[in-house]
From Swiss-Prot:
Its EC number is 7.1.1.-. This is NAD(P)H-quinone oxidoreductase subunit 1, chloroplastic. It is a multi-pass membrane protein. It holds the Pfam family NADHdh. One of its GO terms (biological process) is photosynthesis, light reaction. NDH shuttles electrons from NAD(P)H:plastoquinone, via FMN and iron-sulfur (Fe-S) centers, to quinones in the photosynthetic chain and possibly in a chloroplast respiratory chain. The immediate electron acceptor for the enzyme in this species is believed to be plastoquinone. Couples the redox reaction to proton translocation, and thus conserves the redox energy in a proton gradient. It is found in: Plastid, Chloroplast thylakoid membrane. Belongs to the complex I subunit 1 family. NDH is composed of at least 16 different subunits, 5 of which are encoded in the nucleus. It catalyses: a plastoquinone + NADH + (n+1) H(+)(in) = a plastoquinol + NAD(+) + n H(+)(out); a plastoquinone + NADPH + (n+1) H(+)(in) = a plastoquinol + NADP(+) + n H(+)(out).
Length: 360
C-alpha cells in the first residue's frame, strides 16, 4: 500500500509539473503580445500628440496644453470621450457590414506588427516570409473600409469606400514592387535578414543608397496607403464630409481614428526596416551585435531607441507633408499611381534583377 501511495504521489507530481509547464507556456505566449500592444498604444498616443504640436507650430498657433503637461494626455482624453459617446447605427444600413468594417481595418493593421524587428532578437514572429505576410495582411484593410462604406447606406460613405479601395489597389502594386527589389538585394523575405544585410557599413550600407528610386516610390506609396494628405481622397471633408466614416460615432469612429495612426506607424517602421538599416548604428564598423554580446539588455535597449528614432524621423516628414501640400484630385491621384509610379517601380525591379544576375 505504501508503494502504491508513493507511486500515486509521484504520478500526481508529474501531472502537476506538466500542467505548470503548460501554464507557463501560455503566459510566455501572451506576455510578448501584451508588451507589443502596450508599446503600440503608447506610440499612437505620442504620434497624435506630435501631430497636434507640429501642426500648431506650422500654423503658428497654440497646440494642446491643458490635458496633462504640454497637452500630452490630449489623445487619451479624446479616446475616453469617444468611448462614452452613443454608438449610432444607420436605420437602413447593413448592420453586420457596418459593425465588422472598423474591426477588420484595425485587426489587419495590428497583425502586421508581428513581423517588425524592433531590435536584435526582439520580434514577435521571425518568419521567412515576413514581408510577404505584411503585404498580404495590409491588403485586407481596404475591404473593411469598403464594407463600412457600403453598410452605411450613405452616398458619401459609399463613395469614400470606393475611393479607398481604388487608391489602395493603385498604390499597393508599386509598393510591392519596391519591396521585391529590396528582397532581391537581401536574398530574403525575412525582415530580420533584410536589416542584417544593411549592417556591414553603417550609414553607407543602408538600402536607401542602393535603392534611391525605390525609396522615393515607397515613401509616396506609403503616404497614399495611409490616406494622408495630399492623398486623403477617401475622407475629403469638402467633398465627402468624412467619407466612409460619415455615419460612425463613438467607439467605432475611434477605431477608424486609431487605425489611421496605426497604419502610419507601421509604414514608418517598415521604411526604417527596409531602407534605413533598422536597429543598426549609423556609424560604420560599429555593430549593435557587439553591444548585444556584451550586455543583452543594454544592446536591446539601444536597438529599440535607434529603430524608434529613425521611425519618428519619417513620422515628422509625414506630418509636415500633411500640413504643407494641397490635396490632389482623384484623377491626378490615379494617374500618379498607374502612369508614373507603377512603370518606374517596375523598371527599378527589372534593373535590380539584372544587377543581381550579373553579380552572380
Amino acid at each position: 500500500m505504501i508503494i502504491y501511495a508513493t507511486a500515486v504521489q509521484t504520478i500526481n507530481s508529474f501531472v502537476k509539473l506538466e500542467s505548470l509547464k503548460e501554464v507557463y507556456g501560455l503566459i510566455w505566449i501572451f506576455v510578448p503580445i501584451f508588451f507589443l500592444v502596450l508599446g503600440i498604444i503608447t506610440g499612437v498616443l505620442v504620434i497624435v500628440w506630435l501631430e497636434r504640436e507640429i501642426s500648431a507650430g506650422i500654423q503658428q498657433r497654440i497646440g494642446p496644453e491643458y490635458a496633462g503637461p504640454l497637452g500630452i494626455l490630449q489623445a487619451l482624453a479624446d479616446g475616453i470621450k469617444l468611448l462614452f459617446k452613443e454608438n449610432l447605427r444607420p436605420s437602413r444600413g447593413n448592420t453586420p457590414l457596418f459593425s465588422i468594417g472598423p474591426s477588420i481595418a484595425v485587426i489587419s493593421i495590428l497583425l502586421s506588427y508581428s513581423v517588425i524587428p524592433f531590435s536584435n532578437h526582439l520580434i514577435l514572429a521571425d518568419l521567412n516570409i515576413g514581408i510577404f505576410l505584411w503585404i498580404a495582411i495590409s491588403s485586407i484593410a481596404p475591404i473593411g473600409l469598403l464594407m463600412s462604406g457600403y453598410g452605411s447606406n450613405n452616398k458619401y460613405s459609399f463613395l469614400g469606400g470606393l475611393r479607398a479601395a481604388a487608391q489602395s489597389i493603385s498604390y499597393e502594386i508599386p509598393l510591392t514592387l519596391c519591396v521585391l527589389s529590396i528582397s532581391l538585394l537581401s536574398n530574403s523575405l525575412s525582415t530580420v535578414d533584410i536589416v542584417e544585410a544593411q549592417s556591414k557599413y553603417g550609414f553607407w550600407g543602408w538600402n536607401l543608397w542602393r535603392q534611391p528610386i525605390g525609396f522615393i516610390i515607397f515613401l509616396i506609396s506609403s503616404l497614399a496607403e495611409c490616406e494622408r494628405l495630399p492623398f486623403d481622397l477617401p475622407e475629403a471633408e469638402e467633398e465627402l464630409i468624412a467619407g466612409y466614416q460619415t455615419e460612425y460615432s463613438g467607439i467605432k469612429f475611434g477605431l477608424f481614428y486609431v487605425a489611421s495612426y496605426l497604419n502610419l506607424l507601421i509604414s514608418s517602421l517598415f521604411v526604417t526596416v527596409l531602407y534605413l538599416g533598422g536597429w543598426n548604428f549609423s556609424i560604420p564598423y560599429i555593430s549593435i551585435l557587439e553591444l548585444f554580446q556584451r550586455d543583452q539588455i543594454f544592446g536591446t535597449t539601444i536597438g529599440i531607441f535607434i529603430t524608434l528614432a529613425k521611425t519618428y524621423l519619417f513620422l515628422f516628414i509625414s506630418i509636415a507633408t500633411r500640413w504643407t501640400l494641397p490635396r490632389l484630385r482623384m484623377d491626378q491621384l490615379l494617374n500618379l499611381g498607374w502612369k508614373f509610379l507603377l512603370p518606374i517601380s517596375l523598371g527599378n525591379l527589372l534593373l535590380t534583377t539584372s544587377f543581381q544576375l550579373f553579380s552572380l
